[in-house]
Amino acid sequence: RTEGAHAGYRIADRTFELPEVKLLVDLVQSSKFITTKKSRQLIGKLEQLVSKNDAKKLQRQVVVADRNKTSNEKIYYSVDVIHSAIAENRQTRFHNFDGNVRKEMQLRKNGRFYQVSPWLLTWDDENYYLVAYDADAGKMKHYRVDKMLDLSAVDQARRGQTDYEQMDIASYSRKNFGMFAGEETTVQLLCDTSMTGVIIDRFGASVAMRPYDETHILARAQVAVSPQFFGWLAGLSTHIRVISPDSVVNEY
């Protein structure tokens, strides 16, 4: 409570400081997973966590671009359904889609439903993924949440608990470039020394590396051999080259 001519009440302390809220706003702005409409709604709610003056400062800095934002408004419903299914130990089913050349949604598997046992939601490379057990394939798989339609929980108990408990999600994410599956293989990469940071960022600080000569290093890592891995290599082809095993060299 304040005294004097302008007596009244003021908030002595706030849970969030302006830099903290600004960080959250930046994350919402840059997230491809969150639609433009939802981004503006969330930022409006975040502005309520700071004073009116600080909120005005945020508003002057906020620009929500449509570029690379998803258009699937059902994502938030999907996340809620998945969380509930995990908590209730239930399976889920959904349609999965890709975009065609006309930028239209095209259902995968000829429109058949996917039915899986959900175990984890994870964030990777600016996208949200469901990690789930596919009983037909007998293994864990991953699915982009923004590519799901018609998602619902199924009154069947989840399967694959042993597979999930044996799973190292951090290692799994590192090996599955772009979160597309492929055969797991240990590869050896010949890299410019300037690529040391790139290798650590991609494979983690525990990646095996050693000097090769004055300008190169050798790195060994387990990866999921897939078009996404080869695409990553192609983007760095003048600096990083796969040299073994021969099967991967020949496939690339």
Predicted regions and their residues:
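Short beta-strand micro-motifs enriched in acidic
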Residues: 2, 122-124, 212
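Core beta-strand-centered patch of the WYL/Sm-like small regulatory domain
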Residues: 66-188
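Beta-strand-connecting loop/turn residues
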Residues: 5-7, 126, 146, 214-217
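General beta-strand recognition
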Residues: 10, 93, 129-131, 218, ...
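Bulky hydrophobic/aromatic content
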Residues: 11-103
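Minor-groove-contacting beta-hairpin "wing" of winged helix-turn-helix DNA-binding domains
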Residues: 1-12
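Polybasic (Lys/Arg-rich)
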Residues: 169-252
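Non-catalytic surface loops within mature trypsin-like serine protease
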Residues: 13, 147, 155, 191-193, ...
